[in-house]
Amino acid sequence: LPRLVGRAQAMGLAMLGDKIPAERAVQLGMIWQVVEDEQLQAEAKKLAEHLAQQPTYGLSLIKKAIHAAAENNLDEQLILERDLQRLAGRSSDYKEGVQAFMQKRTPEYKGC
């Protein structure tokens, strides 16, 4: 939490235990987005559909890098990201993305 919101904010949040309005959680960087209750299902479906059209293998590598960044020092993170870039560059989705770009068409990712 301190890495996410800073030491002072983390101390206040943890020690006071106050409820945080959703908008404040967005401001602190604790969550990404707020939607109205009645829009939650529709927004979740829209997001899932969007992500499913993306290069899911590449997205998994992005998640790995972001999660590791919380624990790694800079040198460790740079090495990890280099290695992940190599993996991504060898994937079928990478090749499809480049071909689609060159052919000016929408890519059709397969998740590998």
Write out the residue ranges for each language-model feature.
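Bacterial helix-turn-helix/winged-helix DNA-binding modules and their immediately adjacent linkers
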Residues: 44, 73-79
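Helix-loop "lid/cap" segments that line or gate small-molecule binding pockets
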Residues: 13-14, 65-69, 84-89
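Crotonase-fold acyl-CoA enzyme core
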Residues: 1-59, 91, 96, 105, ...
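A short structural micro-motif
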Residues: 68-69, 104-108
